[in-house]
A protein has these predicted regions:
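Glycine/proline-centered hinge or cleavage motifs at structural transition points of membrane proteins
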Residues: 50-51
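N-terminal secretory/targeting leader peptides
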Residues: 1-46, 56-273
Length: 273
């Protein structure tokens, strides 16, 4: 099953349970784009827990996961820019850059920055980068190791809090869920919601650490995004952010309010609240 078909596969009963990034289905999953915006928290755990709180408070009622039993949501670690032939030091370095992206906000952000993003599943990244079809990719460090890209990428431009994020849903076929006993349902729900968000975030943070170590061992050069680059990206990202707020309104969600509360929750979670 191709990754973008995961949601339909679970809904239609081809598989019982799975998880997948909402970036693959941006038309269906508009609200999960929120934690993908530039300016997230320092870790996957922080982002995941904050996003989970906002989802269940504001987004669940929009029913974007209609047809499946949603167990939880989470995010991957702070996404960064990885390239093969040249480093990204300034916003001009992004212009015309052929970048593999997962879709959603990462695609919109790439377009806003003047790059040439194209959507392909993460599983095709090695072939795309090694063959020169793609000049780079937007990924968290975890994915570099997972897809053996430390053998291909030469540069990583690192943004505090990430250049972008990616939201995931964990869901089960509704009929399979309905057939479970109440005791089994309760057991599953006891580790779902915010608990699964925190666990998934912690696991991704460990994998991001391993990814960074793999890249260091492979000799990948890391560039800390300069204050000017961060400022330039934020200016372009503001347009993407405003578009998401307008799109959220089509789901009867006050996007500005939800986003402001999400950013406050990022601070709360980072402070241990």
């Amino acid at each position: 099953m191709a990754p973008p078909s995961t949601f339909d596969g679970v809904r239609d009963g081809l598989v019982d349970v799975s998880f997948v990034t909402a970036s693959y289905t941006p038309a269906r999953h508009v609200l999960p784009k929120m934690p993908e915006l530039t300016g997230g928290g320092a870790t996957a755990e922080i982002n995941s827990v904050a996003y989970s709180r906002i989802h269940w408070k504001y987004f669940q009622a929009a029913n974007e996961y209609k047809g499946v039993k949603l167990l939880g949501v989470f995010t991957h670690g702070p996404g960064q820019i990885f390239t093969v032939k040249k480093a990204v030091n300034t916003i001009d370095d992004l212009k015309g850059l052929k970048v593999r992206v997962g879709g959603g906000i990462s695609e919109e952000l790439g377009q806003a920055l003047g790059a040439s993003p194209f959507v392909k599943p993460s599983t095709e990244s090695y072939e795309l980068l090694s063959s020169g079809v793609a000049d780079g990719t937007f990924f968290p460090p975890e994915s570099i190791k997972a897809f053996k890209l430390e053998k291909v990428v030469k540069y990583g431009t690192i943004f505090p809090g990430g250049f972008y994020g990616s939201a995931f849903g964990v869901f089960m076929n509704q009929e399979k869920w309905d057939k479970l006993s109440k005791a089994d349902q309760d057991a599953i729900m006891s580790v779902s919601g915010e608990k699964i968000a925190r666990m998934a975030g912690q696991a991704w943070d460990r994998a991001d650490h391993d990814g960074m170590e793999a890249m260091k061992a492979a000799g990948v050069t890391f560039i800390a995004a300069s204050p000017q680059l961060i400022k330039d990206v934020q200016a372009k990202a503001a347009v993407v952010e405003q578009k998401w707020i307008k799109d959220a309104a089509t789901r009867n969600v006050d996007g500005a309010k939800a986003l402001a509360e999400f950013r406050q929750e990022l601070k709360n979670v980072a402070a241990g609240k």
